[in-house]
From Swiss-Prot:
Natural source organism: Staphylococcus epidermidis (strain ATCC 12228 / FDA PCI 1200)
Superkingdom classification of source: Bacteria
Entry GO terms, CC: plasma membrane
Protein's name according to its UniProt entry: Uncharacterized lipoprotein SE_0142
Cross-referenced NCBIfam families: SA_tandem_lipo (TIGR01742)
Keywords from the UniProt entry: Cell membrane, Lipoprotein, Membrane, Palmitate, Signal
Keyword Membrane: yes
Amino acid sequence: MKHSSKIIVFVSFLILTIFIGGCGFINKEDSKETEIKQNFNKMLNVYPTKNLEDFYDKEGYRDEEFDKDDKGTWIIRSEMTKQPKGKIMISRGMVLYINRNTRTTKGYFLISEITEDKNGFAHNKDKKYPVVMKHNKIIPTKPIPDDKLKKEIENFKFFVQYGNFKNLKDYKDGEISYNPNVPSYSAKYQLSNNDYNVKQLRKRYDIPTKKAPKLLLKGDGDLKGASVGRKDLEFTFVENKEENIFFTDSINFKPTERDES
């Protein structure tokens, strides 16, 4: 009888230990998700910045690579990529280099066609259209005979100008990844079509699917680091071998290149 009681006590203790350990693991995961959200909030607070010239006065995270007199350059990029079934993958987007030293901005509109050869190797065919920004307006620096393309470039809006993450804290059940050796971290969430940012993307782009996207937040650097470094966003609507639809956005604060100073 005593032997049976000992077994029951031992089994009960083992179950309790596993339960407590499991709760500890869950709490640890929740804590890491909260930490990642807090870190992303530092960058996502710039969404929306309707006037891109406001970046001239925004300070980002400065590491040892910055010269003391360098105010830094913001690099912003937004791009929509679509590959309908049976067709090639085409990306359309824009990159701007916002120089805080000279308070000037230049960049390019990019159309990229990605094909795959019979051996499975990908090949890119890129076409760039140089632009500058003045008074928050995008201006092509070379003649563009295609009026439709010219208007697309001139009317282009970056995601940072209309995106909003004030409800980030409400995103639940994220897939969390953290590698302290790099260090790098990410969080992935399944969104609904009622999400504000999803509605904004559908309003601005022809997205040929009713599927709601997954949002992937990616960052590099110490989670406890201050201010904004590099962060990437990806809204994936469809992803498989035959069809792909995704939108990417990134904000990066870097030392200014010498020829840009």
